[in-house]
Curated annotation (Swiss-Prot):
Protein name: Pre-mRNA-splicing factor 38B
InterPro entries assigned to the protein according to its UniProt record, in alphabetical order: PRP38
Residues of the signal peptide: none
Organism of provenance: Rattus norvegicus (Rat)
Pfam family, one: PRP38
Amino acid sequence: MANNSPALTGNSQPQHQAAAAVVQQQQQCGGGGATKPAVSGKQGNVLPLWGNEKTMNLNPMILTNILSSPYFKVQLYELKTYHEVVDEIYFKVTHVEPWEKGSRKTAGQTGMCGGVRGVGTGGIVSTAFCLLYKLFTLKLTRKQVMGLITHTDSPYIRALGFMYIRYTQPPTDLWDWFESFLDDEEDLDVKAGGGCVMTIGEMLRSFLTKLEWFSTLFPRIPVPVQKNIDQQIKTRPRKIKKDGKEGVEEIDRHIERRRSRSPRRSLSPRRSPRRSRSRSHHRDGHGSSSFDRELEREKERQRLEREAKEREKERRRSRSLDRGLDRRRSRSRERHRSRSRSRDRKGDRRDRDREREKENERGRRRDRDYDKDRGNDRERDRERSRERSKEQRSRGEGEEKKHKEDKEDRRHRDDKKESKKKHSRSRSRERKHRSRSRSRNAGKRSRSRSKDKASKHKNESKEKSNKRSRSGSQGRTGSVEKRKREHSPSREKSRKRSRSQDRSHKRDHDSKDQSDRQDHQRSQSVEPESQEKEHKNKDETV
């Protein structure tokens, strides 16, 4: 807010003069309706936006070209304040068309393909529209917009201010903004490359009545609002020639406005007719002569003012020519610099390309050497793997042979063990059968002996009982006789015989057992010898 105060203080006088001139013209023409001023003091400084708050209601093709242009991304990015953007407009803007001259190829295309609505092929977007979108990014206030449309240095600053209003403000407020400037006669060339000079008033009338602006479109105005604007414009016809006092007053106002905008002043001093008339009336006593003199002075004043206007126009033309020459020179310098830079860049690129090619060749050589070494290593590895596989095969064959021999040995041993087990089983069966037969014979013998002994014992007991019964008195004698009998040699002989028989029987049994054992040992000793012989014979055959 504080940065914009100097620009507004110097422009307050032209604003009030323009508003007063419009009111006087309406009263003289008979327009009874009172119009609203462009900006009232009661309104706030915050300026509301209408439509899309991100794209500023611009055509998408133009917006994408603005955002992708290096001028907007690099140079305008450094501008941060309102005054810096205004200075950039003063030095860079030469037309108000959206595209630069010759950048869009639309020859032979008609309708929508011709780019009438901005949907054709894009081109180089103009600096004017880049700066217009930069103003939109700054979010201008009401006072800043008024400073743009009443600026005194360049008509292109005013034109961009009016375009900002046309794109961002509601359609119902456009008449309030543009009404006091519809008769503004400041000239500007709006076409790229020149050839389309119009005044500020004519440009504003086209803004209000037409949607097309060269190869783009303004935001659409609703039908009732458009009808209202058309009716109000019909009541305000554009005045081409002005006669009498009204023309003089308009010329005076226009000259005052020019003087307030330009620092230079005209050579003829401004004098009011009342003061000249009063002075001449006091000097000369005759009123007719004073009136004639006053008329002559007024004619001279008008002539001088016309000459001053012509001089101002010539100065403007010379200034515009000088500006054009300066711009062309600066552009030619920039082109020369850009060409020299491009040449330097091309040389640097060539050197870089050569270095890159050399590095690539070195890398290729390294890769080739590495591939060769790698191939040699692979061949060595293959030979080693082949040798290892041969060794492993030979080892595997030897191990397989050993394994087969071990298996055969195990089979022979198992066969021998099985044969031994079978032989031992058969021998054990024979032994068991023999032992059973022997035990049976021994049992029979023992049974027969026990029967004999029992029968003998019974007989003896019977005899003893008979003897005891017979000789009860002769007990002692009988006992003595019995003792004698028992200790008689026949009795002892019989006992000795029985004992000798038992001993002989035991000896026979022991001898039989020893013979069986010896036979078993002989068979066991013979079997391993036979097995060893068989194994040797098999080994010899293998």
